[in-house]
């Protein structure tokens, strides 16, 4: 099968040589202000597009951090960053002071040096909900300023029904908490107490939601609760234990998957079993829905499976391994950006989904193709607009790909200078006649027409030369003015 041409990109790779704190990356996140945060095995690096600023802990720095290895980052509704370290401790980085805050130390009676965080979620009202194993759930609040984080409420584990097994918070500030004893709780926005909605035979493992309901999935059933009043409807499962659930906002449908590979759709007050055409996954581990209503199924098999409700069929995608033999990575992810759906597959495989061809195409990582630039075991990736950030297991470091929406042609200058830096461009300008003027570090000035053919070259300027060209400007008469470094 002929491969599609991948999107044209401009690539850049960053490592410790460029200022990153470590080349092993555990998470990548682009925040609401455009900064890129990179969690590494030795601290956090923040990239502003030009330089890295690193955050970590060293002996004697009085930092509250208990570990220098970071594994995840998220952002609350006020723009503050929340980090999880390797020992499952959680910290807030105040965006204004750029100082870490030990949030769990605010919880009375909790040893902030010895605990394990299991869930950290943000609502839309400045609240962050943190579940602590064996203790309960803390709700923290903050503001869009330099003020420190505060604790708003704490919900004890015995009152909730044991340790938290799944949690969901909405933008309005409501929280839905499922616990080990099979209890489903709801905490309304701003409230200090939890309301028990029902009890289930097995503890819940996941939540999803649509505009009207919150769905709580257990091995035996799906509990549907009204967002406004919390009224509960039980939807019994099938023969095999349920293992995944997702809401598709396009078709307004909720899907559930099972351990034996069955796929269900919520239909009225029951789970209706689907029988798609194609090879059925052996065991469904996760479900995700994209902006076109396609459901992506993660199973025990390498790769990923597409379920299309419009055609009611499965299609499995898998790439040949192109990484080290000892790579093990069972996390999958789909994300949309640059007009494309990006897919990180189970075990190995990374690419974008071509909707017209119904294929997951490799992204510069097929060793059989001449454009291959990287291996295909991606540790983490993040995409925002037309910029894709990723890190591969083998090459390490941080790779940036700027997706070009319009085709671009790259050409080099035919310099006559023996200086290897003579082609380094320092000034660009397009004049009123559509010609592109290029000034170089070595003092060359060249104009190109619309066909990228050189139509003018600045003659030699004596023994001293032109000097490094740093600025170009056209005046109202069409004259071109050249600014140099030290030569006028």
Predicted regions located by residue number:
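Carboxylate-rich, polar loop motifs that coordinate divalent cations or form catalytic acidic clusters
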Residues: 1-488
